């Protein structure tokens, strides 16, 4: 056993087994899962007296550099050589040194893993090892959840390489791109390492830049509640493989954790998922399987770990359900129509609608489809119980099934007559309300008349009053009526002036119209006596249904000629204040714009204004000649 050649021969056998396992891609429980192939060669170096070294080059596919095992021993190595060399992590003699370099290639790519010398003798041969700690670089960190990053601080000293990884049994796997970067940090500086998900197995790893240095790793998030929140469940990929009566879901985890899964049912997306008794799924290498389940969108898996849980409904991918049910009523029977795409047995039983899904009553009616072609439609006829009852329908050939609660409505036969009666009543009520409102409440489209009061005692003044009335009717538009005695001479002569005036006043009050008083300086009158005139004017103001509007022609009456009792009324000088007067008479701008927009409407209004202007001049000449023979008095024009 002291021969170097014999030792090399014995050592080559386990190494050859390792490489053959790698080449054949055989999974070994004690080795990482490798995907590359290697070739093994052994060479014995005889140049050193008393010390024999052997190198085992490893030619790794898709790698630019070669890696090798280096084994050194002295000729006096105690027996058995194989046990002390391969079975013991540290040899009993300080003079024995084992330095190995090997590759561990995981499913995420190529990564070099190094073991360190077991004694201080090996550390002295490392470059720059005198300035490093044997335990790797120290560092501190801060979690920055708002930016999804971890800030790592390296104390003053040499540069260090830092990274984030997910700790598995044999290695700390890199994160997915673009979070798999490694950053070099100078001593006394900080660096932010972004992460995709905050998970309990996430670790922070730091190492110096020299070859074969120890990596210092911290995995502090196992006890952090934040690591089991929404990020934990977002990082898991759920894949549904459910079919027939088997509920299957495969999980792809980023952490080596074992979750618990139970069957639950959820009434709607906002209510909690209620766990069913004795419905725990079996787990096998990330696959969760539950047998004898009716695949329904409201039957879900509830995964839990520690104090965190997540509900995943595997059959909500948009595919059609395996079976559906509809119902129809005929005479005293209820007919259930089952459409199924698989062999199944369906049952139904009457239930009280107030007791929910657990209140089925006997008897139970069933129908099966166990042979023949599918899909198929099955009809189950059930005697009608009573009005207001509901029926439970479920798949009875499985252990876990969702129950449908159907409540037949037999009132649809009278629904047409009821709707027709309601429509007739609604229409009648609407007509009555419209008529009532049109009678009592004047709408915005109803016309309001204008009562024009005057005291024209000459032919020129009467022509001027008629022209003013025609001008107001044309300018107001919208069918507005102007009431003046000159246009109703026959009616005034038949009933008399005073009855006509009171009838016109009542109409204006009923239709919420306006009284316009036209004032001018007339010939001799008893109005100059003072008190009788004041009393008559006050009586006229009180008798008006609304506040009086006073208008006067500037050539027939001056502002100071208006009596004192009437000076408190709104006054309008014609024809200068005609726009203000029209607004006071509730002339709508939309009506004016519509009427004036017709062809010739502006020309008609212009001709009315010119006629009023000419008649005003003619009446002023007549008043001037009459005033030379008698004093001036006040009167209505």
UniProtKB/Swiss-Prot annotation:
Q: How does it assemble?
A: Forms heterodimers with IL17RE; the heterodimer binds IL17C.
Keyword Nucleotide-binding in annotation: no
Natural source organism: Rattus norvegicus (Rat)
Segments in the Cytoplasmic topological domain:
437-637
Q: Name one Pfam family in it.
A: IL17_R_N
Annotated Gene Ontology cellular component terms = plasma membrane
Among InterPro entries, the record links this protein to: IL-17_rcpt-like, IL-17_rcpt_C/E_N, SEFIR_dom
* Topology relative to the membrane: Single-pass type I membrane protein
Molecular function terms in GO for this entry?
interleukin-17 receptor activity
Its name, as the record gives it, is: Interleukin-17 receptor E
Q: Where in the cell is it found?
A: Cell membrane
Q: Where is the SEFIR domain?
A: 447-583
